[in-house]
Amino acid sequence: MTLAQFAMIFWHDLAAPILAGIITAAIVSWWRNRK
């Protein structure tokens, strides 16, 4: 495994949950503002 491959796996493991959390928070806040 090269350093680039390790960095990509590490980035995806960190970025995926963070992005999911941001998207979820955005949808929840939009849903609350809509009501």
Swiss-Prot record:
Its main location: membrane. The keyword Membrane applies. Induction: Expression of the proteinaceous toxin is probably controlled by an antisense sRNA, in this case RdlA. Only a few of these TA systems have been mechanistically characterized; the mechanisms used to control expression of the toxin gene are not necessarily the same. It is found in: Cell inner membrane. Pfam families: Ldr_toxin. One of its GO terms (cellular component) is plasma membrane. It comes from the Bacteria. The chain crosses the membrane at residues 8-28. Disulfide bonds: none annotated. Keywords: Cell inner membrane, Cell membrane, Membrane, Toxin-antitoxin system, Transmembrane, Transmembrane helix. It is a single-pass membrane protein. Belongs to the Ldr toxic peptide family. Toxic component of a type I toxin-antitoxin (TA) system. Inhibits ATP synthesis possibly due to its insertion in the cell inner membrane, ATP levels drop over 50% 2 minutes after induction. Overexpression is toxic leading to cell death, it inhibits cell growth within 30 minutes; C-terminally tagged versions of the protein are toxic while N-terminally tagged versions are not. This is Small toxic polypeptide LdrA. It comes from Escherichia coli (strain K12). The lineage of its organism: Bacteria, Pseudomonadati, Pseudomonadota, Gammaproteobacteria, Enterobacterales.
